[in-house]
A protein has these predicted regions:
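Active-site-proximal region of nucleotide-activated glycan assembly enzymes
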Residues: 2, 32, 53, 116-179
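Conserved nucleotide-sugar phosphate-binding/catalytic loop shared by glycosyltransferases and other
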Residues: 3-10, 30-85, 231-233, 323
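Donor-nucleotide binding loops and adjacent catalytic segments primarily
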Residues: 46, 178-183, 187-272, 305-309, ...
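Structural loop-to-beta junction motif characteristic of Rossmann-like glycosyltransferase folds
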Residues: 52, 120-121, 270-271, 288-296, ...
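Glycosyltransferases and closely related glycan-assembly transferases
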Residues: 87-100, 107-123, 136, 140
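Acidic donor-binding loop of glycosyltransferase active sites
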Residues: 97-99, 263, 267-281, 289-290
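A short, well-ordered alpha-helix in the C-terminal region of glycosyltransferases
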Residues: 343-357
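C-terminal alpha-helical cap of glycosyltransferases
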Residues: 356-373
Length: 373
């Protein structure tokens, strides 16, 4: 069988596609896979790292601004949609897939629209409780809509198309024990690791907080810190810390632009500091990781805060709102949690209770079903 996946923009859209493709590859070893992504975006780097071919489409997002610059950008985007639709149609005709699957990002629209008009079976996965603009636009075109939450059904005009699957997690997240992961990262089994990661693109405000927090560490804090700054912010974080905390190794700090070995790093983590995107939550619940969440305020309908409050209510997360804490208060909370093994254990159990471990298999079943129609 042949499958086309389309996804892009952030790891939260890319990783679910990689998870499903990886499982399909195990179930159907002779299958062929092709990814379509947005030119110059993160998927063009992450997908080939997993061994898949990806072709770029010239597609850009819509700006919600109302000024002349935003209008000009949106006019260019509309032109790019037409061009990328034609490109996608030609690629689909040439590849002849049995199904086309989208997992989020604006590149999904022209690809799934083209597949639909060519009568190729289509499915889209929406990991957030509230669908994004692209998913809304595709709802009437695709054959199946797979969602992460039961409450999501209400947002779709044809609920009979909607199947609750959970959000898929890559198989690599089951590949490491905590002790093995710590050993490979150069840590002893009893050394604590705090992982700080704020979305695949990074987050400006949280990088400011972390550049203020890191100089407060002197190497005797009782834990190692691994901070992923994100490609956009990494140079600025490095420049700042050269002045305020030049000896990162002595402070037990590992600063990275991007955490490419996320399954290993998360397996080793004793506590995670992060955003509340749906894909991140799926990975954290799958691994049962205690978490301090700072939901992004820059998302539609505050869906990240809603995601985080579910975890908080279950007892697996502490939720802090951006702008309502500083580096010192965050460090104080980190220290308090790491000092309370019983609390960490209960948070871990609560996170694990929310996992949907068979989400990837559910989605693969749906994809194979439509491909065989």
């Amino acid at each position: 069988m042949k499958f086309i996946f389309t996804c892009g923009g952030t790891a939260g859209h890319i990783n679910p596609a990689l998870a499903v493709a990886g499982r399909l590859k195990e179930l159907l070893p002779d299958s062929e896979f092709l990814f379509l992504g947005a030119e110059g975006k993160m998927e063009m780097e992450l997908v080939p790292r997993e061994g898949y071919q990806i072709k770029p489409l010239k597609i850009t997002n819509l700006s919600r601004g109302k000024n002349l610059k935003a209008l000009s950008h949106n006019l260019a985007t509309l032109k790019n949609v037409v061009v990328s639709y034609r490109e996608a149609k030609a690629i689909i005709r040439d590849f002849q897939p049995d199904a086309v699957i989208g997992t989020g990002g604006y590149v999904c629209y022209p690809v799934l629209k083209a597949a639909s008009q060519l009568h190729i079976p289509t499915a889209v996965h929406e990991s957030n409780a509230v669908p994004g603009l692209t998913t809304k636009m595709l709802a009437k075109l695709v054959d199946r809509i797979m969602v992460g939450f039961e409450e999501s059904r209400q947002y779709y005009p044809q609920p009979e198309k909607v199947i609750v699957t959970g959000t898929p997690v890559r198989g690599q997240f089951a590949a490491y024990t905590k002790a093995q992961a710590k050993r490979e990262l150069g840590l002893a089994a009893d050394e604590k690791l705090v992982v700080s990661v704020w979305g695949s693109l990074g987050a400006g405000h949280m990088n400011v907080i972390m550049t203020e927090l890191i100089p407060l560490l002197d190497g005797t804090q009782g834990f190692h810190l691994l901070h992923g700054a994100g490609k956009m912010y990494y140079p600025g974080v490095c420049e700042s810390l050269v002045k305020t905390a030049p000896d990162l190794t002595g402070r037990k700090v590992d600063l990275r632009e991007y955490i490419f070995d996320m399954p290993r790093v998360m397996a080793a983590a004793d506590l995670v500091l992060c955003r509340a995107g749906a894909s991140t939550i799926s990975e954290l619940t799958y691994m049962g990781k205690p978490v301090i969440m700072v939901p992004s305020p820059n998302v539609t309908n505050h869906h990240q805060e809603r995601n985080a409050r579910v975890l908080e209510k279950a007892g697996g997360a502490k939720v802090l709102l951006e702008g309502e804490f500083d580096a010192q208060s965050l460090l104080k909370l980190v220290r308090e949690l790491l000092a309370d093994e019983e609390k960490l254990s209960s948070m871990s159990a609560a996170m694990g209770s929310l996992a949907v471990p068979d989400a990837t298999d559910k989605i693969c079943g749906i994809v194979m079903d439509i491909a065989n129609q």
